[in-house]
Design a protein with these regions (language model features):
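Mature-chain termini and adjacent capping regions
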Residues: 1-233
């Protein structure tokens, strides 16, 4: 096995070690830098330790330790991961990246994309679909509301969020407190937004209480009014 090592002694001549892996990353070359690097040319695996930074196209991923496979372009960062990609800013204890698309972030995950913040113990994000999945203890905070649920699916490109299991939605700006088994939030930009609550649905606004198997909350334009029209079904 042939292993090329860049050891701490080289720090006498450079503050940061880095290698460019354009020969393996196709149209999107990867640059890896760290205090120390080990590269196995047979397996194509890079092991980086200390002040690790991976840069590819418009994404920058940092952490304490990382492994990167140049052949399948899979990366894993531990010791506090921080990803910045376009309008996404994500922090977590660890992070795995697959196929330049799937991101699996674990441990106190905080993901910010535009006006939406997603938190949970683990977030799976698919960048091509702009789809995020949180399977437990999930929270999503939008412009003027917050939703918690056992499971959350966020379709960020469509401004749509589906919460399943023990759903709780609050909005201080609109004075809403609502619960249900399932909630679907549509934050349409060019249309009236709405929230559909299903299963043991209950909504409270300004002391008014509505209950039903299904409730639809139509959200008025916040710039004009904080009114919410609730339609039982």
């Amino acid at each position: 096995m042939k292993i090329n090592k860049i050891k701490p002694l080289l720090l006498a001549t450079c503050l940061l070690c880095s290698i460019s892996l354009s020969a393996y990353a196709g149209d999107k070359p990867m640059e890896v830098s760290a205090d120390t690097l080990e590269y196995d040319s047979n397996t194509g695996v890079v092991v980086a330790n200390g002040n690790v930074k991976l840069i590819q196209d418009n994404a920058t991923l940092t952490g304490a330790k990382a492994t990167y496979n140049t052949k399948n372009q899979e990366a894993e960062v531990t010791g506090g991961a921080h990803l910045v990609k376009e309008d996404i800013n994500l922090t977590s204890a660890s992070l795995k990246s697959k196929n330049n698309d799937e991101i699996i972030a674990s441990g106190n995950v905080i993901m910010v994309k535009g006006d939406t913040t997603i938190t949970g113990p683990q977030v799976n994000y698919y960048s091509k679909q702009q789809y995020a999945l949180i399977n437990s203890d999930a929270t999503v905070t939008m412009k003027d509301s917050t939703m918690t649920a056992d499971k959350l699916e966020a379709y960020l490109g469509e401004n749509k969020v589906i919460g399943t299991g023990n759903v709780h939605l609050t909005s201080t700006a609109r004075d809403i407190d609502a619960v249900g088994d399932v909630a679907t939030y549509y934050g349409a930009k060019d249309q009236q937004g709405k929230i559909i609550l299903e299963g043991n649905a209950k909504a409270v606004q300004k002391g008014n209480i509505l209950k039903g198997n299904k409730l639809t909350l139509f959200l008025a334009d916040k710039a004009k009014s904080d009114e919410v029209v609730i339609k039982p079904e």
